[in-house]
Amino acid sequence: MKRTRSALPANFDPVYPYDAPKPSTQPPFFNDRKGLTESSPGTLAVNISPPLTFSNLGAIKLSTGAGLILKEGKLEANIGPGLTTNQEGQITVEKDSDGLTFTSPLHKIENTVSLSIGEGLEDESGTLKVNFPSPPPPLLFSPPLAEAGGTVSLPLQESMQVTEGKLGVKPTTYSPPLQKTDQQVSLRVGPGLTVLNGQLQAVQPPATTYKEPLLETENSVSLKVGAGLAVQDGALVATPPNVTFSAPLEKNGNAVSVRVGAGLSIQGNALVATTSPTLTFAYPLIKNNNHITLSAGSGLRVSGGSLTVATGPGLSHINGTIAAVIGAGLKFENNAILAKLGNGLTIRDGAIEAVAPQPSFTPVTLWTGPDPNVNTSINGTPVIRSFISLTRDSNLVTVNASFTGEGSYQSVSPTQSQFSLILEFNQFGQLMSTGNLNSTTTWGEKPWGNNTVQVQPSHTWKLCMPNREVYSTPAATLTSCGLNSIAHDGAPNRSIDCMLIINKLAGAATYTLTFRFLNFNKLSSSTVFKTDVLTFTYVGENQ
């Protein structure tokens, strides 16, 4: 006989036998609008914007401009001599400061600043005032002098002029191209003109040549223009290129604007960073001073600034996923690692076993014969006619049975006590003499060609017995059992219950089948004890 193996759970995994699967930790597992981002992909980083930046050590720091300074981890105003801050944090001038100097007419004496004043000025109740002198007597003017609105003027004829405050005769003036040299008047001529024999004449110009971008065509000169230039209404103009704008830039008419998101705004035509809300960090993120770290538990680790899954022997990272490294004799099937089995091998109870070639199987039936006598005893008295057949086909055994009472068990009432009919078999599947249906009655194998009973034992009888590994402890099946159903035409209150108990061992028996009849109180009155055909199945024993 084979050694009985301890049963394993149906979901037992021999390759990865852990109590519970670990949760997946593949990124992303964060909200990229809540202070975190991926930089580069698959790497967790803090999402910051100016004035926040990173130091050379990777810590978050604050960039400061003119007038600001970081002191002992706090942002303060950078103030110079003569200035200080009061208890309210306001910038004020120092009382005993030498930062202010005074020059005449201002003078500082202790805590008082005074103003020196001269003639024509006076201090009237703290107000500086000008003292005007008494006006002189009015003046009288005679021609050619004239007075108008407080101004004295001298009328001049066309030949007179005032030069540097002096009255003189206005000289004769000549406008270009006439010019006066000493006492002579001459005519200035430019290119293309000359004076010959006292006469103004035109000078014939030399032949004109044109270089690019000028182009002469017949009697006209034109200008060749390239990309970005054009001639419109006789004028050279620049044509704007076809410029496209990508986000965050956008064009509206002739104006180009920039779109801003959270943390940015436009103030005074300048892009500035708005104050970001205070960052809070939830587990597994931990903030320590100015550093943010990620708490990694079992199965995780931080490597090269990235969160990765810690793998042990037999596991590796392939294309960003965890894969098992398998060798010869193993394979992947339905997301599980299985052993590759050749001919003659199988897996039983999680272990690889060698199996013998399966012979061709012929169904086996053990029975009482088609019309047995009163073959079952209760308390030593034959009182039940039992028809029982056990048929092994493939791995299952089908039980067909019916029972008819005789004598004191010909009829039963609602007060009938429950009773059992037991069949006991030895290790070879042979019926023993210790049960209610025993070896003294007709019992054996049914041939294929007739309805006789072959009582000569065979090694195949064991195949009809219950499998001892499957039914290592007693197992039961309860079914309703109708009594004399044909005569009563299936009337209600004419059924009891029958329980088949498998391998409830007692004494020297190796296998047992127990038919237990109970719940007679379901009957409405006395009834003939003639059961319907009962059918059960169980797993058969190995050869």
UniProtKB/Swiss-Prot annotation:
Induction: Expressed in the late phase of the viral replicative cycle. Keywords: Capsid protein, Host nucleus, Host-virus interaction, Late protein, Viral attachment to host adhesion receptor, Viral attachment to host cell, Virion, Virus entry into host cell. This is Fiber protein. GO terms for biological process: adhesion receptor-mediated virion attachment to host cell; cell adhesion; symbiont entry into host cell. The tail region anchors the fiber to penton base capsomers, whereas the shaft, built from several repeated motifs, allows the knob to protrude from the virion. One of its GO terms (cellular component) is viral capsid. The keyword Plastid does not apply. Residues 1-36 are annotated as: Disordered. Forms spikes that protrude from each vertex of the icosahedral capsid. Interacts with host receptor to provide virion initial attachment to target cell. Fiber proteins are shed during virus entry, when virus is still at the cell surface. All late proteins expressed from the major late promoter are produced by alternative splicing and alternative polyadenylation of the same gene giving rise to non-overlapping ORFs. A leader sequence is present in the N-terminus of all these mRNAs and is recognized by the viral shutoff protein to provide expression although conventional translation via ribosome scanning from the cap has been shut off in the host cell. Belongs to the adenoviridae fiber family. Homotrimer. Interacts (via N-terminal tail region) with pentons. It is found in: Virion; Host nucleus.
